[in-house]
Amino acid sequence: MLDPALLRQHPADLAERLRSTRGFSLDTAELESLESERKRIQVRTQELQSQRNSKSKAIGQAKAKGEDVAALMAEVAGFGDELKASEDALDAIRAKLEGIALGLPNLPAEGVPLGKDESENLEQSRWGTPRQFDFAVKDHVELGAPHGWLDGETAAKLSGARFTVLRGPVARLHRALAQFMLDLHVGEHGYEETNVPLLVNADSMRGTGQLPKFEDDLFQTEVGESRRYLIPTSEVPLTNIVREEIVDAERLPLRMTAHSMCFRAEAGSGGRDTRGMIRQHQFEKVELVTACAPEDSDAEHQRMTRCAEVVLEQLGLPYRKVLLCTGDMGFSAIKTYDLEVWLPSQNTYREISSCSNCGDFQARRMQARWRNPVSGKPELLHTLNGSGTAVGRAMIAVMENYQNADGSIDVPQVLRPYMGGIERIG
């Protein structure tokens, strides 16, 4: 959530910044009308509260003197009805204003390129040279499906489209990748392994920015009066660990990692990436989350992105690093780097990691704070999140980049200890 002071004091300036950087249209006329109405109702509510308190005090004094208080009691009762109506009206208009505030995207950091979509992202660097094959390259489906290792048909029978059953050595490769990533981030990068719930409440989804804007892309479940959401990323539970907390400065930065299932409805994906495992309703990811002091978030962003890069480098997978433009950034981010891995079958780079600095945007929604030792006062944290990396896409990249002419797949050196020493699949 953006600073409410921006909405109240500079709505026109904020609207222009949102329009020019995010392509977002803020109705300032509606906002100013609601804010004016809020002030009017709030003043009247405070007047009624003051009158009620004054009359209540007078009742106490009259009772102490043994005087008849019936008339005063009747006045207070009248105030009570009007006060309740005024308080309800104030709550309703505050809810409308909060709804507007919750729907506003974050403002990009200085230096983020202006642009309308991914075509205007800026490539920062490349690592590795895509392999030149002397045979016809197969995609991950052609490599896995003939052996039954990758089975979309059975998954469709069980669950519908955009699910996959993995078997045998490919299922083991998938598991090995997740274990390798976790061990790397915990053992070498200093993240704390954390096992988190896959079902979270609405407050958690609001805290990280999935609600209310992206509800259509979420799976949810209701039991009785209890509603829970399946997480689209473990960023949600990891980041919400600091919700409504005041963290001591000595504990910062908090660096957490989790391997989890992720669930996405892919409501806006249409017919994109329907083949294989590129875009699934259920997939696995190793997530990185950091909460830190504001002055450290830029450095933590660079560090987090580098941690994700190391995963790909140790796997020997060519990739490129891209700085996202304003039109391609996520809702909560002020700055985002994407890592895109080379897929030979598509002859292009595809996203495998996205690392974002969210500034104080999520922290304000969550009331996640730290105690500044200089001022001694609680201040908003900065939060960051990144994929370290998507497990399914890493498996696809390994299968395709390490394939042989006979359809077998070499196992990258760093994964062999997790594969029982197996050097080749197939």
UniProtKB/Swiss-Prot annotation:
Molecular functions per Gene Ontology: ATP binding; serine-tRNA ligase activity
The organism's place on the tree of life at top rank: Bacteria
Enzyme Commission designation: 6.1.1.11
Protein's pathway: Aminoacyl-tRNA biosynthesis; selenocysteinyl-tRNA(Sec) biosynthesis; L-seryl-tRNA(Sec) from L-serine and tRNA(Sec): step 1/1
Residue numbers binding L-serine: 233-235, 287, 387
Keyword tags: Aminoacyl-tRNA synthetase, ATP-binding, Cytoplasm, Ligase, Nucleotide-binding, Protein biosynthesis
Reactions performed catalytically: tRNA(Ser) + L-serine + ATP = L-seryl-tRNA(Ser) + AMP + diphosphate + H(+); tRNA(Sec) + L-serine + ATP = L-seryl-tRNA(Sec) + AMP + diphosphate + H(+)
Pfam families in alphabetical order: Seryl_tRNA_N (PF02403), tRNA-synt_2b (PF00587)
CDD domains: SerRS_core
One annotated GO biological process: seryl-tRNA aminoacylation
InterPro entries noted in UniProt: aa-tRNA-synt_IIb (IPR002314), aa-tRNA-synth_II (IPR006195), aa-tRNA-synth_II/BPL/LPL (IPR045864), Ser-tRNA-ligase_type_1 (IPR002317), Ser-tRNA-synth_1_N (IPR015866), SerRS_1_N_sf (IPR042103), SerRS_core (IPR033729), tRNA-bd_arm (IPR010978)
UniProt binding sites for ATP: 264-266, 351-354
Enzyme class, first EC level, given as a word: ligase
Principal subcellular localisation of the protein: cytoplasm
Assigned GO CC terms: cytoplasm
UniProt subcellular location: Cytoplasm
Quaternary structure and partners: Homodimer. The tRNA molecule binds across the dimer.
Purpose of the protein: Catalyzes the attachment of serine to tRNA(Ser). Is also able to aminoacylate tRNA(Sec) with serine, to form the misacylated tRNA L-seryl-tRNA(Sec), which will be further converted into selenocysteinyl-tRNA(Sec).
Homology family: Belongs to the class-II aminoacyl-tRNA synthetase family. Type-1 seryl-tRNA synthetase subfamily.
Domain free text: Consists of two distinct domains, a catalytic core and a N-terminal extension that is involved in tRNA binding.
HAMAP family for the chain: Ser_tRNA_synth_type1
Full protein name: Serine--tRNA ligase
Source organism of this protein record: Xanthomonas axonopodis pv. citri (strain 306)
Classification lineage: Bacteria, Pseudomonadati, Pseudomonadota, Gammaproteobacteria, Lysobacterales
